[in-house]
Design a protein with these regions (language model features):
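Extracytoplasmic catalytic/substrate-binding loops of multi-pass membrane glycan-assembly enzymes
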Residues: 84-96, 104-119, 124-128
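Transmembrane and membrane-interface helices of multi-pass
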Residues: 72-74, 152, 157-178
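Transmembrane signal-anchor helices characteristic of membrane glycosylation enzymes that use polyprenol
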Residues: 3-19, 34-43, 47, 63-89
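Transmembrane-helix motifs of polytopic, lipid-linked glycan transferases
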Residues: 132-157
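Hydrophobic core segments of transmembrane alpha-helices in multi-pass, intramembrane catalytic enzymes
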Residues: 38-42, 95-96, 113, 138, ...
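Specific aromatic-rich, kink-prone transmembrane helix
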Residues: 101, 144-147, 190-209
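Aromatic- and kink-enriched transmembrane "portal" helix at the membrane-lumen/periplasm boundary
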Residues: 21-27, 111-114, 127, 131, ...
Length: 215
């Protein structure tokens, strides 16, 4: 109940902060749809944060590893974002951003891109907010990769591996093209990381012997 109340309060606060970026008509159906989606995401974020804190306090090994691997990569991305603030924008990105101010979708760039922009901007109501949210998500994904690799190695290998070796997971994600792509709020960035995360999850489930059904 407390988590839901916090999410509702957060959603209510956005009614006062949206003016920093948006110029929408609250009487349109789009307003209610996006606020409902924001409420769901806010609840998920609050619940996730509470759960993470509980796991860290309980000494959960995977949670601690995830935080330990996420923060260094996030720090690198935030330094780069600070240098290129508010991100690396192209004409297509700006077209989506322009329509997002009035909660309109850019059909040419797919409505999911517009949805990601609008919801990100409700969390952080400035153009750079889209890139900031993107950086947080991507850093969390890379942290999950490293933590999962360490977890799998510990369970599947007979000889222990020093934790420092798992820093090698960072290498492909520290290449300049990848770091620069992370600062570009384009649909290919969102779709690429979504696909990569899904593929990694499937591989991890396979290596863990997780079954999707009883067959």
């Amino acid at each position: 109940a407390a988590e839901l109340a916090a999410a509702v309060l957060w959603c209510a606060l956005t009614l006062g902060t949206d003016w920093l970026f948006f110029r929408y008509d609250w009487r349109t159906p789009a307003f209610f749809v996006y606020k409902a989606l924001f409420l769901v995401l806010a609840f998920g974020l609050v619940h996730g944060a509470v759960t993470l804190v509980q796991k860290l306090r309980a000494g959960d090994k995977f949670a601690r590893r995830w935080v330990a691997w996420t923060l260094p990569y996030l720090a690198v991305n935030l330094v780069i974002l600070l240098i290129v603030w508010p991100g690396i924008w192209g004409n297509d990105d700006l077209a989506v951003l322009y329509l997002a101010r009035t909660l309109q979708p850019n059909s040419w760039q797919h409505f999911l891109t517009s949805g990601a922009f609008i919801l990100s901007l409700m969390f952080v109501p400035m153009p750079g907010g889209v890139v900031l949210v993107q950086n947080l998500l991507i850093s969390g994904i890379v942290g999950c990769f490293a933590a999962t690799a360490q977890d799998l190695a510990e369970k599947r290998l007979t000889r222990p591996v020093r934790p420092a070796w798992f820093a090698l997971v960072y290498l492909p994600f520290l290449l300049p093209p990848v770091l620069m792509h992370t600062q570009q709020p384009f649909r290919t960035t969102w779709s690429t990381w979504t696909e990569l995360n899904m593929e990694f999850m499937l591989v991890a489930m396979y290596l863990r012997g997780t079954k999707l059904n009883n067959k």
